Amino acid sequence: MPRATLPPEARLHRPSEFAAALKGRRLARGAFFILSAAPSSPPPGQAAQARLGMVIAKRYAAHASTRNALKRVIREAFRHCRLELPPQDYVLRLHSKPAPATLTSLKRLARAEVDAHFARVRP
């Protein structure tokens, strides 16, 4: 079984990559996140694979600890299912302000929603 790592090649880095993925199809929308995807455009010499980008705006998650916790949850969920996803560029965007809750309960809710979004995409 291959290792479920998240190398730099599995992440979006350039603003143009984010823009292309955000203009692509919207695959899922939940209480917190919108999942968009576009065909993967890997750098020359690399095979097409699922890549992840995240947009967690300060407008919706004012505290840095909240933003960082959400990003950690998203990365971990993607890391576990990355090899099963079709080779596309995925962007998860926070679209609403989470209700006041403890960080633990927020992470639990976010993980459930992100897992559900990626489950819809798997073949």
From Swiss-Prot:
- The UniProt record lists the EC number as 3.1.26.5
- What keywords sit in the KW lines? Endonuclease, Hydrolase, Nuclease, RNA-binding, tRNA processing
Q: Name one GO molecular function term.
A: 3'-tRNA processing endoribonuclease activity
Q: Tell me a GO cellular component.
A: ribonuclease P complex
| Catalytic activity, reaction form | Endonucleolytic cleavage of RNA, removing 5'-extranucleotides from tRNA precursor
An example GO BP is: tRNA 5'-leader removal
The record's annotation in NCBIfam families points to: PRK00038.1 (NF000707)
Please report which protein family the annotation says this sequence is part of: Belongs to the RnpA family.
What this protein is reported to do is described as:
RNaseP catalyzes the removal of the 5'-leader sequence from pre-tRNA to produce the mature 5'-terminus. It can also cleave other RNA substrates such as 4.5S RNA. The protein component plays an auxiliary but essential role in vivo by binding to the 5'-leader sequence and broadening the substrate specificity of the ribozyme.
**Oligomeric form and interacting partners:** Consists of a catalytic RNA component (M1 or rnpB) and a protein subunit.
Protein's recorded name: Ribonuclease P protein component
Q: Which organism is it from?
A: Bordetella petrii (strain ATCC BAA-461 / DSM 12804 / CCUG 43448)
* Lineage, broadest ranks: Bacteria, Pseudomonadati, Pseudomonadota, Betaproteobacteria, Burkholderiales
